[in-house]
UniProtKB/Swiss-Prot annotation:
The keyword Transmembrane helix does not apply. This is Glutamyl-tRNA(Gln) amidotransferase subunit B, mitochondrial. Gene3D superfamilies: 1.10.10.410. Residues 29-52 have a biased composition (Polar residues). It is an enzyme of class 6 (ligase). It catalyses: L-glutamyl-tRNA(Gln) + L-glutamine + ATP + H2O = L-glutaminyl-tRNA(Gln) + L-glutamate + ADP + phosphate + H(+).
Length: 557
């Protein structure tokens, strides 16, 4: 039997629990981004837009943009923040809902230790001050996917505050022109996620799935230190990498594990800040950048035409490429914050304040968690540059694709090829094939061992560079053959017979007197042409370096 789905009809807005089958042909989701497998892997690829938002041209209008972000990251935990219900993205609707999640009378919250540890580790990684005492509050508002009518959050005294995030930004067209910028972090707070509403326009109904209700969230509030969509996207991407390195959140935007709200305003430099608008629920980095840049340009255009900016909430229509008004915020909503009466203050300790004889399972030690912090992305990039001598932009590329750094390091372990060549093959060949077929690293038919074997053959000069590319193409077919087998079957080995190479070179010299004449005139292109003719005659099995030596000797160059 299918799992139950809460159905909420519009007319009377009454709750009713009904059994629905697995079909949902006419159900339209509330997500604003792509949900296909292709789109999940290619979150950076936007759909064609009808309205193109251009970045404000600096100096022409003399406008300054101010952008602040509120980032909601779903905590990686086995159970929810205040209940024992399991966390699973793909579970059937309403199959992972405890009595507390459904807000049945008499149920009480029990704080999840793992979520607190995740918040502390994230705060430490983001250079925040960890508050040894933090408080929980109720934030009241009515929405159909929030059964209790309030959300448990940390409005008064959050678990972490006053941090900063350093991210890198490209100054020009060349990838090597990289600089770092810093955005301040106002606070990090623990809070509950809400359920999910799926709007059925055909039947004028809203379907409620409470599987997500009560999952632990980290809300990271960035100060308005950003000025454009590109900066915002790069800052969020760096935060995403940090969360994934810590293991505190999978931060998969396609699955709603990382959602961003952007607060945007424009003003003339030296004047007070303008009226801000909030763009909600941006679920991809590309859409985040496009939405912010569009909204900046929209506000500038509105003000220059004599209009005014409303303090409103907007959404981003990824199909049209523009923001649309959702609801007016002029009449500021009163969330009626109040202390959560069912949760005592959250008290943390460090080595200096830890009570003597305290049970480690009953307390959380900040210093102990600090010692458990893994290598963060910035340190990893610096290590890659120093250890392997790679360019900074290459270290960024290795970390930017999930699983690519691990793939690279596994290849390095199994080959004696110099790291620069391995980097070149991983980024320019392997990654190119992945992108062409929209595959994740984990889905690649070429394993690190297979690529390492191919590079070893190339390093020993058993095959040429062009032959290596042929072998890689065969490996990509995933037929289970090794690189050595492919080389043997297709006779791609370099010619080792010196006498045969001598004859081949002499035959080429005799057959192309005009090219030989050009070579003797010191035409640099002519010698390369002659080498190419010899390689063609050898079916690309002759070593170009060896051919060049033989030709130079024969032609007395």
């Amino acid at each position: 039997m299918a799992a139950p789905m809460l159905r909420l009809g519009f007319p009377g807005r009454r709750w009713a629990l009904t059994w629905l089958d697995g079909g949902s042909r006419h159900r339209s989701g509330s997500q604003t981004g792509p949900t296909s497998n292709w789109a999940r892997r290619q979150s950076s690829v936007a759909q064609p837009s009808l309205h193109t938002a251009q970045k404000p041209r600096k100096g022409e209008h003399k406008w300054a943009a101010v952008v602040g972000l509120e980032i909601h990251a779903q905590i990686s935990s086995n159970s929810k923040l205040f209940s024992g219900a399991q966390v699973c993205f793909a579970a059937p609707p309403n199959s992972l809902v405890s009595y507390f999640d459904a807000s049945l009378p008499g149920t009480l919250p029990v704080l999840n230790r793992r979520c607190v540890e995740a918040a502390v580790m994230t705060g430490l990684a983001l250079n925040c001050h960890i508050n040894k005492k933090s408080l929980f509050d109720r934030k009241h508002y009515f929405y159909s996917d929030l059964p209790a009518g309030y959300q448990i959050t940390q409005q008064r005294l959050p678990i972490a505050a006053n941090g900063h995030l350093t991210y890198c930004i490209y100054l020009g067209k060349k990838p090597s022109q990289v600089t770092t910028k810093t955005v301040r972090i106002k606070q990090i707070q623990l809070e509950q996620d809400s359920g999910k509403s799926l709007h059925d326009d055909l039947r004028s109904q809203t379907l409620i799935d409470l599987n997500r209700a009560g999952i632990g969230l980290l809300e990271v509030v960035l100060e308005p230190d950003l000025c454009c969509g590109e900066e915002a996207a790069l800052a969020v991407r760096e935060l995403q990498l940090i969360l994934q390195a810590l293991g505190t959140s999978q931060a998969n935007m396609a699955e709603g594990q990382l959602r961003v709200d952007a607060n945007i305003s424009v003003h003339h430099p030296g004047e007070p800040l303008g009226v801000r608008t909030e763009v909600k629920n941006l679920n991809s980095l590309r859409f985040l950048a496009k939405a912010i840049d569009y909204e900046i340009q929209r506000q500038i255009t509105e003000l220059e035409n004599g209009g005014e900016i409303l303090n409103e909430t907007r959404s981003f229509d990824y199909k049209l490429g523009c923001t649309m008004p959702m609801r007016d915020k002029e009449g500021k909503q009163d969330y009626r914050f109040m202390p959560e009466p069912n949760l005592p203050p959250l008290v943390l300790y460090d080595d200096t304040s830890l009570p003597r004889g305290a049970d480690s399972q009953q307390v959380i030690n900040i210093d102990q968690l600090r010692d458990m912090l893994p290598e963060l992305p910035s340190a990893t990039r610096e290590r890659l540059v120093q250890q392997y001598g790679m360019l900074p932009e290459h270290s960024f590329a290795l970390l930017n694709e999930v699983g690519l750094l691990e793939f690279f390091q596994n290849v390095i372990k199994e080959t004696r090829t110099e790291p620069k060549k391995v980097t070149n093959w991983v980024l320019n060949t392997f990654l190119c094939y992945l992108k062409q077929q929209n595959l994740a690293v984990s889905e690649s038919p070429v394993t690190p061992s297979a690529l390492a074997e191919l590079l070893n053959l190339l390093d020993r000069k058993a095959i040429s560079s062009s032959a290596a590319k042929q072998v890689f193409e065969e490996l990509w077919k995933g037929e289970g053959k090794t690189a050595a087998q492919i080389v043997s079957e297709q006779q791609l080995e370099l010619m080792q017979d010196q006498e045969a190479l001598e004859k081949l070179c002499q035959t080429t010299i005799d057959g192309h007197p005009q090219v030989v004449m050009d070579v003797k005139k010191r035409n640099p292109k002519a010698i390369n042409k002659l080498i190419g003719l010899v390689r063609k005659a050898s079916h690309s099995r002759a070593d170009p370096a060896l051919i060049k030596k033989i030709l130079e000797r024969k032609l007395s160059l």
